[in-house]
Amino acid sequence: MVRRFRGESHHKVDTKGRVSIPASFRRVLESSDPNWTPGDAPELVIVYGDHRRNYLECYTMEAIEEVDKKIDALPRGSMERKMLQRLFHGQSYPTNVDETGRLVLPAKLRQKIDLEGEAFFIAAGDTFQVWKPETYEAEELAKTEEWLDELPEDFDPLVFLDGAKGE
C-alpha cells in the first residue's frame, strides 16, 4: 500500500478556493482512506490551528487516525489532551477530493496562510503541506539551504539515518 507522499508542485488556486491536488498525492489519499472505493472521492483532514505554522497540514484518513489514537491514550482532562484535541479535532477541516481531483479550501484556511492565485504542495511523509509559494521559499527553503551549508561539501545527509530505529 502506498503510504508516503513524495514530491512538490505548484498549482493555481481559483477565486472560489479550488486547487488541483497532484495526481500522485491523490493516489496516496485513495490508498490511505479505508472507506474509499474506485469512483468515490477520497477523504482527508486539513489541520490549520497552530498559529506558528504558515501552512496547512493535510492528513490521510489513516494518518489522522494514528494521531487520534495517540490523543485518546492521554489521560482525560489532562492539558495535553485538551490542547491536542483542540488542534487536531477542533481546528481541523475534514474534506474530500472532488471528482476533478481538486480541493476546495475555505476562505478561512486561505486567509490563514495568505493564499491566493497559486499554492505550493510539498510532501511530508504521511502528510502533505499546502503553502503560499513565497512563504515556503522565504521560510523553509532558506532553512534547508542554511542547514546544508553548515555541513561539509562531501557530507551525505543519509548518515543521519544510520542507527535509526526500525532498521
Where is each model-derived feature located?
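Flexible "stalk/tail and boundary" regions
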Residues: 1-11, 15, 25-95, 99-100, ...
